[in-house]
Each structure stands twice: as C-alpha cells, then as structure tokens.
C-alpha cells in the first residue's frame, strides 16, 4: 500500500468524522410545537421490502418535488450502479402510532418543519428548494407577499425505518452514467455570474437530482392541514376546531382521538363553519387502494383501519435526504474532480437557492453597470473554489446620477433620474425567516450624497463608492473535507515534482 494511499485514507476518515462531530446540530424545534402527543404500541408483522423502502437510494431534484401533500413515488434517478439493499440498509422496527398536532404561527415555521422532517439543510430552508412543497399544502396562498398561519392534525403509524449504511454510500459504485457526466463537467468556471457557464451543472442536477433518499420511514399516515392568511388573525383554537371538523365532519369532530378535538363544542363547530380556511387532507403509506378511498370527511373506523395497515402493509410515509454533492465530495477528495463537486454545491446553494442571478443596467453613456453577480471569492482556491454573491457599490456610478437640489445638497438618483444607476441597498425579510440584502437603482426622493458632491450649483459623482458588498458566501460551505483535499493535492504535486 502506497504512503499516499495510507495518508489520504487516514485524512479522509478524519475529515468525515470531524464533519459529523463539528457540523452544527440543526434546531428541529420550531414554533409549530407538537402538542399533547399520544402514543400507542402496535405489533409489526411486515418484513422489509422494496415497497417499504420505496425510493431509498434514488436521486430527486428536490426543488421540483412536492414533499408534503402526496404519496412520494419511487421514480427517482439511479445514483448507484449496484446497491444491494439487504447488505446496505439498517432496518429498525418502530411499531408505534402517534397522534399530535402542529401549529404553524408563520410561513417560516412551516418551512422549518419541512426542512427538519426531511433532514434538508437549514441553509436550504427557503422558497427555491422547498417552495413547491409549501405551495402544495397551502394551495399557493403562501408567497413572498403573504404570510400564513395554520395547523395540522398528525396521525402517524410507524412500521419501520430503513437507512442506508454510510459505508455503502461512500464506497458502492456510482452509476456509470453519473460518473461519466460528472467527470465531464468543467473544473474551471470562467464567468460564474452567467447562468450559461453553469449549463452542464444544471443539466446534471436536472438529470440526477440535488438530493438522494438516505432514509425511508414506512407505515401509514393521515395529515389534516388547515391554513389561512395571517392577516385573518385566527387563533390556535380556531385552527384546531377547523382541522377536527375538516377531518371527521361536524358529527365526529370530537371522536378522532386528539385531545384538542375531544372538547370541541357545537358552538365552536358553528363558528368554524363561517371561517374561511384552506383545507388539505394528506394520506400516505398503507395500501394503495385504501389510500384512494380516504377522501372527504373520514369516520373514526376508517382512520383506525388505515393506521393498522402499518402492521402488515406499510409503504413510505416520510423520506430523509442527503445532498448529492456530499456523496461526490467524499468520493473525489484528493482528485482533480473534487473541485467539480464543490462547484456543484455552491452553484446550487448560492446561485440557485439564494438567488444570485446576474443583474445589470445601463448608465447615461449606455455602459453596462453591474448590480448583482455570482463571482469568485478573493480567497478562492482552484482546487476547492469558493464563490460569493455580491452587489454593486452603493451610491452614484455616473455624473448623471447626481442632481442639485435647493438648499445646496445633492440627491443620488430619485424619481426623475434618467440614468438610474445610483445604486441603493435594502434588506428583505423572506418568509422562510432569513434575510437578503438586495441592490436596486434608486428612484426614491431624499437619497442624499452617496458619492455625489457639490460643484458650485451643480452635482457630480466625484467620490463614487468602489466597494462591493457580499450578500452570500460559499466559505460557509467549506469544511474539513476541503482542507483535507488541499493537503492531498499539495502532496500529490510535491510527489510529481520529485
């Protein structure tokens, strides 16, 4: 065994271990706190099967998938050439039925709930990656302009959990097509702010997906969601009553096995009938024919019969995911292809998810003025590139941006500005809970100076700001594996120079 192989193996093992130990533990508690959880034991007679494992090991382009409101079918892309399930999975029998409810006091808490339950990174808790799922369960009333609140009644019969072994994920042969397409990617992106520069990377994500299913939980489940716009100002109890009535109808609303539903009064039911909310019933797992029959208002016998199917006929009710770039980085550390896996990760997180498309305008001389761009960080290393999203310097860019105003002051931009290249920043609060610094040509009155200076009774852009501001940094995605890769590449170069 060569010294290089020994060193690389040891460093890779150490890096993966350190990542697991040092990566931040995601806070899975959100404001959609589960209340009054009731648990009962069931006997599981079913054995692990292709049906119970579902899409385990398959790749999906998560931002196109509805992870909440329908049965998630095993129609993903092949990622591994050979992945023997009996050898590569750890299956744990669960055997519990849980009844609880989750209150979502904001759109952010709904996003957090989806990210937590699917193990999708908190940094991807936003509209690009999870927007399709949130829109599906709220009937599109959740948007960048509209905040929502809501509640779900959750009936979950857990049969078993099947999770891929880390050793198999890191060592089993990848699909020959995936390997061929990945290794054909460009290592160096010459103009990272242009989407066309990332065409092959985008095609790879579309073909193989951004994430693979790392864990499948099977059983049978029923979720009754109710949502309304936050400005309607319904309280927690109003959502609870509406969910109970929506699930079982007015006559059986108090008989569905939830503590919050048990005390529903006739007066509350009548009041709820006049409250307009979005209702969504989601049935997952169990038998296909049983799922198809569970529509509209359900009686307690229907509910219990379906939940018990978890004992004998479980199918997937929940999936947990892992990014495809994590698998590729682990596979290609210490090789010339590692940079491509880093590129893929930062392109997805920074360019696509954060939303760092190239924005520009023209000044009074028709010269191009850049507003936002995805570019290399100053400290970027070709072996493991680092990118940033940055916005143009705030203030004037051209003399025509500056306008003399009475009382001897200069306005930058404004409603009558024709140049429209006086750039201004604003911080937008996203409904996913995060914030984003944005840059735009200022058309509002009162934006004084900002590079404009008085020259007699005229104003000129005599002191323009030259400093771009970073709004997203790929340095946040750097980890121990990147450091190990750079050590290995440096050693390889030294060995080749001997």
Curated annotation (Swiss-Prot):
<dbReference type="GO" id="GO:0090729">
    <property type="term" value="F:toxin activity"/>
</dbReference>
<keyword id="KW-0175">Coiled coil</keyword>
<feature type="propeptide">
    <location>
        <begin position="23"/>
        <end position="35"/>
    </location>
</feature>
<feature type="disulfide bond">
    <location>
        <begin position="396"/>
        <end position="410"/>
    </location>
</feature>
<protein>
    <recommendedName>
        <fullName>DELTA-thalatoxin-Avl2a</fullName>
    </recommendedName>
</protein>
<dbReference type="GO" id="GO:0031640">
    <property type="term" value="P:killing of cells of another organism"/>
</dbReference>
<keyword id="KW-1015">Disulfide bond</keyword>
<keyword id="KW-0354">Hemolysis</keyword>
<feature type="domain" description="MACPF">
    <location>
        <begin position="23"/>
        <end position="359"/>
    </location>
</feature>
<feature type="signal peptide">
    <location>
        <begin position="1"/>
        <end position="22"/>
    </location>
</feature>
<dbReference type="InterPro" id="IPR020864">
    <property type="entry name" value="MACPF"/>
</dbReference>
<keyword id="KW-0800">Toxin</keyword>
<feature type="disulfide bond">
    <location>
        <begin position="412"/>
        <end position="422"/>
    </location>
</feature>
<feature type="disulfide bond">
    <location>
        <begin position="389"/>
        <end position="402"/>
    </location>
</feature>
<keyword id="KW-0732">Signal</keyword>
<feature type="domain" description="EGF-like">
    <location>
        <begin position="410"/>
        <end position="422"/>
    </location>
</feature>
<feature type="coiled-coil region">
    <location>
        <begin position="135"/>
        <end position="159"/>
    </location>
</feature>
<keyword id="KW-0245">EGF-like domain</keyword>
<comment type="function">
    <text>Is lethal to mice, and may cause hemolytic activity.</text>
</comment>
<dbReference type="Pfam" id="PF01823">
    <property type="entry name" value="MACPF"/>
</dbReference>
<dbReference type="GO" id="GO:0005576">
    <property type="term" value="C:extracellular region"/>
</dbReference>
<keyword id="KW-0166">Nematocyst</keyword>
<keyword id="KW-0964">Secreted</keyword>
<dbReference type="GO" id="GO:0042151">
    <property type="term" value="C:nematocyst"/>
</dbReference>
<keyword id="KW-0204">Cytolysis</keyword>
């Amino acid at each position: 065994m060569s010294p290089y192989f020994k060193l690389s193996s040891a460093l890779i093992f150490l890096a993966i271990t350190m990542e697991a130990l040092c990566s931040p533990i995601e806070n899975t508690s959100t404001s959609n706190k589960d209340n009054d959880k009731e648990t009962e034991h069931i006997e599981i007679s079913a054995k692990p099967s292709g049906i119970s494992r579902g899409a385990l090991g398959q790749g999906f382009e998560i931002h196109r998938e509805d992870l909440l409101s329908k049965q998630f079918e095993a129609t993903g892309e092949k990622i591994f050439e050979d992945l023997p399930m009996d050898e590569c999975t750890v299956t744990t029998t669960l055997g519990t039925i849980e009844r609880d409810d989750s209150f979502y006091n904001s759109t952010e808490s709904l996003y957090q709930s989806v990210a937590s339950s699917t193990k999708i990174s908190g940094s991807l808790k936003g509209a690009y990656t999870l927007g399709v799922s949130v829109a599906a369960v709220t009937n599109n009333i959740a948007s960048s302009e509209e905040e929502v609140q809501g509640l779900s009644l959750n009936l979950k019969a857990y049969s078993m959990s099947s999770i891929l072994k880390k050793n198999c994920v890191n060592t089993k042969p990848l699909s020959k097509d995936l390997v061929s397409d990945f290794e054909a990617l460009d290592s160096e992106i010459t103009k990272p702010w242009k989407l066309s520069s990332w065409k092959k990377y985008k095609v790879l994500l579309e073909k193989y997906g951004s994430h693979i299913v790392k864990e499948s939980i099977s059983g049978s489940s029923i979720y009754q969601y109710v949502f309304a716009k936050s400005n309607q100002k319904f309280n927690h109890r109003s959502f609870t009553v509406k969910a109970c009535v929506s699930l079982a109808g007015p006559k059986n609303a108090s008989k569905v096995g939830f503590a919050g539903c048990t005390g529903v009064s006739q007066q509350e039911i009548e009041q709820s009938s006049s409250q307009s909310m979005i209702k969504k019933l989601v049935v997952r797992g169990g038998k296909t024919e049983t799922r198809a029959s569970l529509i509209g208002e359900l009686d307690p016998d229907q509910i219990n019969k379906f939940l018990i199917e978890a004992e004998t006929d479980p199918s997937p009710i929940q999936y947990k995911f892992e990014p495809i770039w994590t698998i590729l980085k682990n596979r290609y550390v210490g090789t010339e292809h590692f940079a491509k896996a880093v590129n893929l990760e930062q392109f997805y997180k920074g360019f696509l998810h954060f939303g760092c498309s190239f924005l520009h305008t023209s000044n009074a001389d028709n010269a191009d003025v850049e507003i936002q761009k995805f570019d290399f960080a100053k400290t970027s290393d070709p072996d493991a590139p680092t990118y940033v999203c940055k916005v143009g310097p705030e203030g004037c860019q051209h003399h025509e941006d500056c306008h003399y105003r009475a009382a001897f002051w200069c306005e930058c931009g404004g409603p009558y500005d024709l140049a429209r290249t006086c750039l201004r920043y604003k911080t937008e609060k996203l409904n996913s809970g995060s914030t984003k610094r944005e840059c735009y040509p200022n058309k509002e009155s009162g934006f004084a100076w900002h590079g404009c200076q008085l020259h007699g009774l005229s104003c000129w852009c005599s002191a323009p700001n030259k400093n771009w501001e970073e709004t997203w940094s790929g340095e946040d995605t750097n980890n121990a594996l990147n450091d190990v890769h750079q050590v290995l590449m440096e050693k390889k170069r030294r060995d080749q120079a001997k």
